[in-house]
């Protein structure tokens, strides 16, 4: 086990999440506080710990893919980094631009990218199963995003 690669992988993914949270934090207390939300909206305090755990798991998968040479499969590399980019972009669209419709389009693409990432990494390793909690969370977030769009359109 290469501890340096593991730490670098986890920190890289956490850094992307932290960068996205910059757009989120500014809007949670202002714009998002006034948005009509569905009954199944979790409390705001839950999002930080949930995302931290998920980014940690994503970082472990990044490490496993990197350490075991899965990057030689261009599909793994493309879908993995696409889903990270879409994840970051969602915070900008939904919170930064305060645009639930743009966020919805992005998160649907994110759902697809994560599913493909799981499938492509699974061909190499069952470590892709570490992404299942992430997929579950973003599918829930997709439903939440859709409901917020409908309630505020």
From Swiss-Prot:
Keywords: Cell membrane, Membrane, Receptor, Transmembrane, Transmembrane helix, Transport. It is found in: Cell membrane. Coiled coil: none annotated. It comes from the Archaea. The chain crosses the membrane at residues 3-23, 45-65, 78-98, 101-121, 129-149. One of its GO terms (biological process) is tetrapyrrole metabolic process. One of its GO terms (molecular function) is tetrapyrrole binding. GO terms for cellular component: membrane; plasma membrane. It is a multi-pass membrane protein. Its main location: membrane. Binds tetrapyrroles and promotes the photooxidative degradation of protoporphyrin IX. May play a role in the transmembrane transport of tetrapyrroles and similar compounds. Belongs to the TspO/BZRP family. This is Tryptophan-rich protein TspO. It comes from Archaeoglobus fulgidus (strain ATCC 49558 / DSM 4304 / JCM 9628 / NBRC 100126 / VC-16). The lineage of its organism: Archaea, Methanobacteriati, Methanobacteriota, Archaeoglobi, Archaeoglobales.
């Amino acid at each position: 086990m290469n501890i340096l690669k593991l730490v670098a992988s986890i920190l890289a993914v956490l850094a992307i999440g932290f960068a996205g949270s910059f757009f989120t934090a500014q809007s949670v207390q202002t714009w998002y506080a006034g948005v009509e939300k569905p009954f199944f909206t979790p409390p705001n305090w839950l999002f930080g710990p949930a995302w931290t755990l998920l980014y940690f798991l994503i970082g472990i998968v990044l490490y496993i893919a990197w350490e075991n040479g899965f990057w030689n499969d261009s599909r793994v590399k493309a879908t993995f980094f696409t889903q990270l980019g879409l994840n970051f972009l969602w915070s900008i669209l939904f919170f930064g631009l305060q645009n639930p419709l743009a966020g919805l389009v992005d998160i649907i693409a994110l759902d697809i990218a994560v599913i493909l990432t799981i499938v492509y990494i699974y061909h190499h390793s069952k470590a892709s199963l570490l992404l299942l909690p992430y997929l579950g969370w973003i599918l829930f977030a997709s439903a939440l995003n859709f409901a917020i769009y409908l309630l505020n359109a």
